[in-house]
């Protein structure tokens, strides 16, 4: 009978795990074709490959958002698919000028999304007000209403820029797991 690596011989006290034991066990299992990981890492991997996004197209940036779904860019090859309901989506792309009257609707839609939820701010108007920055009716950046994870600059940003922003979000999720707010 072999002793467990977590229990010491004296008084049966629990000690720190023996790293060499786990390394040898991991090497033995890997040789047989198995994958050893934690459930959190598995969920994190699945989350990066199945981002469902919801459009919040407010102005001309929404046209560029449509382009990434066409065959030339085909955002679905990265596991990103559009959804019409906020309850089914975990990424919201805010594209265009956000007015004061639209801000409560943006917050309401954001609150209806399931956790974990991410926001991509697309274009100069969504990032900071854009050309309409000094207007009385414009919110100077959607980050004043909802927390933003990725900013895509440009007026309007190209479809390649949005695609790059989605890939940056996937890297951010892979690197940090769920993003705590």
Swiss-Prot record:
It catalyses: a quinone + NADH + 5 H(+)(in) = a quinol + NAD(+) + 4 H(+)(out). The keyword Membrane applies. It holds the Pfam family Oxidored_q6. This is NADH-quinone oxidoreductase subunit B. Its main location: membrane. It is found in: Cell inner membrane. Its EC number is 7.1.1.-. The gene is nuoB. Gene3D superfamilies: 3.40.50.12280. It comes from Novosphingobium aromaticivorans (strain ATCC 700278 / DSM 12444 / CCUG 56034 / CIP 105152 / NBRC 16084 / F199). The keyword NAD applies. It is a peripheral membrane protein. GO terms for molecular function: 4 iron, 4 sulfur cluster binding; iron ion binding; NADH dehydrogenase (ubiquinone) activity; NADH:ubiquinone reductase (non-electrogenic) activity; quinone binding. [4Fe-4S] cluster binds at residues 60-61, 125, 155. GO terms for cellular component: plasma membrane; respiratory chain complex I. Binds 1 [4Fe-4S] cluster.
